[in-house]
A protein has these predicted regions:
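An alpha-helical, amphipathic repeat domain used for nucleic-acid recognition
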Residues: 1-121
Length: 121
């Protein structure tokens, strides 16, 4: 009974708040851990946070910053990957980005941009 009162009080005063937690978790994971939206969403679901709570905050992620993070990850990975041809390299980069939780449309976009930049040089 006392525990319930304490928890209720903490929730009323916003010390315990799922939305605040989601906002901070999403911000930290995409900015510092460089996770994609899919992996962040899965991690929040594992923490028993309802999708209706975290989905709006995932959509608030700045698209340009998100793509810049993905592009930088792919450029760094490209330097360390050993592949016999362009097809194998692309597959390895796609698998890497998918494992980080990025969406296929964003991965394809960044790989295409990277290939276009390589052709310009």
């Amino acid at each position: 009974d006392a525990i319930d009162r304490i928890i209720n009080r903490l929730e009323q005063e916003k010390y315990i708040d799922e939305e605040r937690f989601c906002r901070a978790f999403i911000h930290d994971k995409y900015r510092f851990a460089k996770w994609g939206k899919i992996k962040i969403g899965q991690a929040l679901q594992l923490k028993k946070i309802p999708q209706r709570v975290f989905s709006p905050y995932l959509n608030e992620i700045d698209e340009d910053e998100y793509l810049t993070i993905l592009n930088n990850l792919l450029m760094t990975k490209r330097k360390s990957v050993h592949a016999e041809n362009e097809f194998e390299l692309t597959n390895k980069l796609v698998r890497f980005a998918l494992s980080r939780g990025f969406e296929m449309k964003d991965i394809r976009h960044c790989i295409t941009l990277s290939d276009e930049n390589d052709n310009l040089e």
